[in-house]
Amino acid sequence: GPMMNFLFAIFVFGLITQLGEETRAPIVAEVEAKSAAENMGLRAGDRLLSVNGIAIESYEDFQKLLNKNRDQNIDVVIEAEDKVRKNLKLAVSSLKNPNIFSSEEFIGTIEGLSSVAKSAVVGVISGSAAYKLGFRTGDEITQINSDKIDRWTKVEEKFNSWIAQAKSLENQKIRITVLRDSTADLKDKSKIDIEVTADQFAKFQTMSDVGFDKPDLYLEQVVKGSPAEQADLQKFDKIVSIGSVKIEKWEQVLNNIKSFNGKEPLAVEIIREGVVLVKKITPQVTSQMTALGQEDKRYTIGILPMVTFAAPEMVKLKAPSLWTSIAKGTSRTIDISTMTVFSFVKLFQGEVSHKNIGGMISIGKAAKDSFEMGIQSFLMTMGILSVSLFILNLLPIPVLDGGHLFFYIIEVVRGSPLSVKKMEVAQQIGFVLLMGLMVLALFNDFTKFFFKT
């Protein structure tokens, strides 16, 4: 039983590598200004070719090598967007692993290097030059002349170039294509072309001078019925301060709300269409599931920032031989088995909510959703489910295969089997435990999909 589940997972994961697995390309997504990563020579768009002489095929390969070389210097060969190759020496530091299901307590990281890139959505200051040219908060810049734009850093590069060369470019026309919300329910977007000339940027020094803002502090959504809605916060409002704290990053918004003392309402200063307003908001305690399955109870006011991330560049990797597929399939099966064991341990320790236990409805929905995403996602889901069944069957619960193994171990230790009566009692206890687990899974499915809790 369990061994067939294990072997099936190896087969499925190996099949994925034979068909060709789509994974993130080894490309630097974003580099924070004035960070260690920038000072060491990394730039957004750089392609990572090798680390300490080891070739890199995917970003996952790069992350594994960072993990292996924590608190050390590494030699990295990169290819910049202009196709020029460079040799860089990078300092790798340690970071506490955010994945609580991993066996590794720390991972390798480079300060200022981001694995995701913000999309080219802009905030626009009311009454600014950018506003007068026709740009609006929430516009997503998708193209500048014939160049496709897929991330914020490309927008910065283009505008800074125009500002620096405004006089020499004179009246050169520039066509900027944006996507903008076009309906009342904000589900559809219209494509708009805005034409400008380079010399219109001659008197400015930075993008901020033109009137463009990073979108981080603008609101994308105000949750219905939330304290924010009751205080009349609206989409595209920009948060300026909370109490006496001037807000520069979204993390400050979260931290100030989470640290609410439960007494006086928070004074939230916002800018709406150029007008400064102060709203009194009393946060409320909400419970929500994190991406890692932990139940997080904290103060919230019901707002989401206008931050979206660009789709990463993908690369399709195919195993060169059958033996490589088997090796990779086995390695991934072992990795996921380890994570599954850790998830069970965290569940019993109470670090992961029991609400994550799902039954047939959850399994069916996962299979359906993954199938709609493509054959690779579907096969990956089947492999993960097979590993879960493998681990579940090995739990030392009578009725399951793991329970039988547990009895055999007892027999070896004692030198004789348990009595029939003790076996019957153990089987009954195991049956009750298994039924309880099934009822809990079914209950979670119904509350999640039918009662939306």
Which functions belong to the PLM regions below?
Residues 105-134, 140, 165-170, 175-179, ...:
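Functional transmembrane alpha-helices
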Residues 395-405:
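Transmembrane helix boundary and interhelical junction motifs in multipass membrane proteins
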Residues 12, 16-21, 349-350, 372, ...:
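Short helix-capping/hinge motifs at transmembrane helix termini and TM-loop junctions
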Residues 2-9, 51-103, 144-203, 270-274:
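Interdomain regulatory linker/hinge segments that flank or connect interaction modules
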Residues 27-49:
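Short extracytoplasmic/periplasmic juxtamembrane "stem" segments immediately C-terminal to an N-terminal membrane anchor
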Residues 53, 146, 244, 402, ...:
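Short, conserved catalytic or interaction motifs in soluble domains
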Residues 1-30, 82, 118, 123, ...:
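Internal alpha-helical transmembrane segments
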